[in-house]
Amino acid sequence: MNNNQNRCGCGGQPTVMDIERETKENTNFRKEAWTGEHMQVTLMCIPTNCDIGSEIHENADQLVCIVQGCATVSFGATKCSMCDGQRANSGDACLIPAGTWHNITNSGNIPLKVYSVYAPPHHAAGTIQRTKTCDC
């Protein structure tokens, strides 16, 4: 197995990563960490009082794991029917089936650090989105 110190962008090769450390060290809003043929891992850093933005992935299931901070997570069949939100903390996981509207808001006082697994991949390999315009 590849245990490369610079794991991000391993091009779908088998690899071992300290995903908690990689997630905590990430300062980009979104950074692709690994992309295979059927799955992808991204790291996110969401500033206080910001969110990922209401979104839906029609053809991708998603697992979002909170590594640092606390969040409010909303789900719904439509954008207008999203629930008021459930509290999620470090160590919690959000399981989001394809076709589900969702949003994750940083409700804490420190940056929210999460990693996300998409199946199949959702973002282009090598994606780095340094910031998000926060309109929240």
Placement of each model-derived feature along the sequence:
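A short, N-terminal "cap"/entry segment at the start of jelly-roll beta-barrel domains
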Residues: 1-40, 53, 86-90, 130-136
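Short beta-strand His + acidic residue motifs that chelate non-heme Fe in jelly-roll/DSBH
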Residues: 52-54, 73-74, 96, 102-109
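Short acidic-glycine-tyrosine-enriched beta hairpin
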Residues: 78-98
